[in-house]
Amino acid sequence: MGLETEKADVQLFMADDAYSHHSGVDYADPEKYVDSSHDRDPHQLNSHLKLGFEDLIAEPETTHSFDKVWICSHALFEISKYVMYKFLTVFLAIPLAFIAGILFATLSCLHIWILMPFVKTCLMVLPSVQTIWKSVTDVVIGPLCTSVGRSFSSVSMQLSHD
């Protein structure tokens, strides 16, 4: 549609000691650096954000606008999306990454140093608590329930039709 979406990627590779020996440029083996642009979303966490202009704005066959309007609106959409994303990331990415790092570090610390020792302690103590609870049940609650059961077992009811 007249809009360039491919990035022009130019890279120059120099060996560390090449500059000190002569003033010319040493070109490194380009096959070593084939995968220089790595995927920033390898686990596809944000695959739902891969929307294009056609995914958001669609004109049915019966209601087409002028071609120039469609091309200009598509170009404006892509440019504004690109510029606003870059603008927002410049001002928000670093502070939000800092806050997320602090939050993650805090939660990790609490989990490692408080929650897991507490859970392990409870799991170690539970067999002893279970034994004590069984003894209390056998000594106190068992006889109490037995005596209440015997008391109510002597009660009898008779129904008469008057």
Curated annotation (Swiss-Prot):
Disulfide bonds: none annotated. InterPro entries: Caveolin, Caveolin_CS. GO terms for molecular function: D1 dopamine receptor binding; molecular adaptor activity; protein heterodimerization activity; protein homodimerization activity; protein kinase binding; protein-macromolecule adaptor activity; scaffold protein binding. Pfam families: Caveolin. Residues 1-86, 108-162 are cytoplasmic. Coiled coil: none annotated. GO terms for cellular component: acrosomal membrane; caveola; caveolar macromolecular signaling complex; cytoplasmic vesicle; focal adhesion; Golgi membrane; membrane; membrane raft. Its main location: nucleus. This is Caveolin-2. The modification Phosphotyrosine is found at residues 19, 27. Phosphorylated on serine and tyrosine residues. CAV1 promotes phosphorylation on Ser-23 which then targets the complex to the plasma membrane, lipid rafts and caveolae. Phosphorylation on Ser-36 appears to modulate mitosis in endothelial cells. Phosphorylation on both Tyr-19 and Tyr-27 is required for insulin-induced 'Ser-727' phosphorylation of STAT3 and its activation. Phosphorylation on Tyr-19 is required for insulin-induced phosphorylation of MAPK1 and DNA binding of STAT3. Tyrosine phosphorylation is induced by both EGF and insulin. It comes from Mus musculus (Mouse). Transmembrane segments: none annotated. Keywords: Cell membrane, Cytoplasm, Golgi apparatus, Membrane, Nucleus, Phosphoprotein. GO terms for biological process: basement membrane organization; caveola assembly; cell population proliferation; endocytosis; endoplasmic reticulum organization; endothelial cell proliferation; insulin receptor signaling pathway; mitochondrion organization. It is a peripheral membrane protein. Belongs to the caveolin family. Monomer or homodimer. Interacts with CAV1; the interaction forms a stable heterooligomeric complex that is required for targeting to lipid rafts and for caveolae formation. Tyrosine phosphorylated forms do not form heterooligomers with the Tyr-19-phosphorylated form existing as a monomer or dimer, and the Tyr-27-form as a monomer only. Interacts (tyrosine phosphorylated form) with the SH2 domain-containing proteins, RASA1, NCK1 and SRC. Interacts (tyrosine phosphorylated form) with INSR, the interaction (Tyr-27-phosphorylated form) is increased on insulin stimulation. May act as a scaffolding protein within caveolar membranes. Interacts directly with G-protein alpha subunits and can functionally regulate their activity. Acts as an accessory protein in conjunction with CAV1 in targeting to lipid rafts and driving caveolae formation. The Ser-36 phosphorylated form has a role in modulating mitosis in endothelial cells. Positive regulator of cellular mitogenesis of the MAPK signaling pathway. Required for the insulin-stimulated nuclear translocation and activation of MAPK1 and STAT3, and the subsequent regulation of cell cycle progression. The modification Phosphoserine is found at residues 20, 23, 36. Residues 87-107 dip into the membrane without crossing it. It is found in: Nucleus; Cytoplasm; Golgi apparatus membrane; Cell membrane.
